[in-house]
Amino acid sequence: GGGSPQDTCKAIGIISNNPEFADVRSLEGLSPTNKPSVPILAIPTTAGTAAEVTINYVITDEEKRRKFVCVDPHDIPQVAFIDADMMDGMPPALKAATGVDALTHAIEGYITRGAWALTDALHIKAIEIIAGALRGSVAGDKDAGEEMALGQYVAGMGFSNVGLGLVHGMAHPLGAFYNTPHGVANAILLPHVMRYNADFTGEKYRDIARVMGVK
């Protein structure tokens, strides 16, 4: 499925082998589990979250109207089938929203303080792929859809190692409190956060502009 079904599956997989953490809220932050998840085979149906390759999962506490992140290297699926045909059923609006989520992953991962040479290479390539394919994917172009499937996966491999930034830090409460779709929340916040960070990330923003074809 998309990010939420895959994250739910990852939480269930962890709790199945670590029943002492049956209340998923006890896993918030850096999870203290001792045993790996039951084997998970992930098949993403959206091109955005990269939940199939990341060490974290996001859970919504509907009672408190908040989202919280659990980080656990035990929860990475053992196998991921990334097939763009599985993503064809997305309506254009969902393709746009999940695509912006993937782009935000790549941009935030590229400029985060923990970034290093390997993650920089992954993120800048992901930005290039996504920027070149997102519009075509939304319009229904199958080749562009395949590129989006690849780009979101590459971004996931990067940010899973270094984390994200202020966009996601604000998008989670915005989504939980106002029920704003996650990709839409990212789209609202990304331009403002990039402007806020511009004084400190100018060189990397130039890299981003270059691979996006901005002149």
Language-model region placement:
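Gly/Pro-rich interdomain helix-loop hinge
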Residues: A176-K215
